[in-house]
Amino acid sequence: GNYAVVGSRYNDTGGTDRGAAFIFHKSGGTWTEQAMVQPSDTANDDWFGRGVAISGDYVIVNAYAKTTNNTGQGAAYIFYRSGTSWAQQAKLNASDSEASDAYSYSVDIDGDYAIVGSLNEDPGGTSNAGSAYIYVRSETSWSQQAKIQASDKEANDTFGRGVTISGDYAAVGADNEDTSGSNAGSVYIF
């Protein structure tokens, strides 16, 4: 494609470690910066931009240290391109967020679907087992379609460390999952 996004989680524009994402456009073989984006509610120590993904006119950027209602619960932001301008379209939060979930540690977007990993989430009280959330876009609104977990979840599996989505499929990594050995890790396909 002709667009790329690069995250900079320790960027200090506006304050300490707020983070930023830089969107580049390729024209005639030359890449130039088209925009720098930050969330509308940017704050110190959000670490916005550790994870980024782009699909067509949409960019998703994580801020896994973001504090909204709970310390370090995390948030993800979707930006939309119109012409040469990029604007925030949505802020995604877990429907069941808690402190230190690291929601949005990993993010991906494909067309009208986005996936957000929450590696420290405690599904069913299983500490740091992790979860992932799938969102769907309808016009300019994004809504949670599903929350997914490992069928064999255990404490500290960190399901959601890495996520990807493509068409009707999603893959979620759990780097500390123990099926093949201590912390050997697994990838789950949905």
Language model features with spans:
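Conserved beta-strand/short-helix segments
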Residues: 1-190
